[in-house]
Amino acid sequence: MEDCLFCKIIKGEIPSTKVYEDDEILAFKDINPVAPIHILVIPKKHIKTLLEVTEEDSKLIAKIYMTINKIAKDLGIEKDGFRVVANCGRDSGQEVMHIHFHMLAGKKLEPK
């Protein structure tokens, strides 16, 4: 997608602080963190929202969760815990229409 912020980050057109990258997934620090540790984990394949995930994408989504697991261990946040959030659509607060998962950690998070 030409105008997608995350697609531009994937292509290297916009800089990011990468935490993890492979052929299918990119994880980077959020530029407006809401927690001391705030990582965005995204597929390199452009999928607008969770509602557009297909059966074909199921392995990719599973791999994203395994990547979240790895990042948590790499950052040492697996012991104290962390939150994973995926917003779906504008009314939920999704600002970038490219599926992404927020990893939030580094402090005790309030229940939502």
Residue ranges of model-derived segments:
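HIT superfamily nucleotide-processing domains
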Residues: 1-112
